[in-house]
Amino acid sequence: MKLSFHGQSTIYLEGNNKKVIVDPFISNNPKCDLNIETVQVDYIVLTHGHFDHFGDVVELAKKTGATVIGSAEMADYLSSYHGVENVHGMNIGGKANFDFGSVKFVQAFHSSSFTHENGIPVYLGMPMGIVFEVEGKTIYHTGDTGLFSDMSLIAKRHPVDVCFVPIGDNFTMGIDDASYAINEFIKPKISVPIHYDTFPLIEQDPQQFKDAVNVGDVQILKPGESVQF
């Protein structure tokens, strides 16, 4: 299995001969190394509806025929208003099996909406974190979130091999809370900081996060770099 980071919260997972992308913010992402014209995916998984996560989902889904997995509200919105054919709606606590592995959505403390060109926001369900089980490994993508103690329950129920955690502050956890979440609650084998440096408001030094973490290994990935099992 291979996990690649592509700026902000975009993760590309390759496992069981399938390709999965999380939060495909590609075209307008100054930190993303991917090209929307050449990306190949079988599944798209969404944590919530903000533009820097919802991103290129419509174009990518139509171009590739990928199945979009997200909240029931996002699935309905994509199907009804954008003509995306392959959607799979879920909600917090739900788990579903796919041919690459399983997806379980868990709690995240954030917000979730998508703003139309007319400026009107559309509610797209609750924000969510994702627990993947692929090739015998557990990956926890926290999504955009603040710190909450039930991260420890998530990790107790699903011992984490790799955790993708936001460190950008302002809109999500910063370095202090993110490192606390890793050290005290999640305790993964590998931590990867995400959701930073894309915009001035979330500029951070990931080395400070690495220095603050005292469990497992911290991998600071540049866009396009990966961890592999």
Curated annotation (Swiss-Prot):
Q: Write out the GO MF terms.
A: hydrolase activity
Q: Which Pfam families match?
A: Lactamase_B_2
Keywords noted in UniProt: Hydrolase
- Does the record bear Glycoprotein in its keywords? no
**What PANTHER family would the database entry show?**
UPF0173 METAL-DEPENDENT HYDROLASE MJ1163, UPF0173 METAL-DEPENDENT HYDROLASE MJ1163-RELATED
Q: Per the similarity annotation, which family is this? A: Belongs to the UPF0173 family.
Q: What is this protein called?
A: UPF0173 metal-dependent hydrolase SAOUHSC_01815
Organism equals Staphylococcus aureus (strain NCTC 8325 / PS 47)
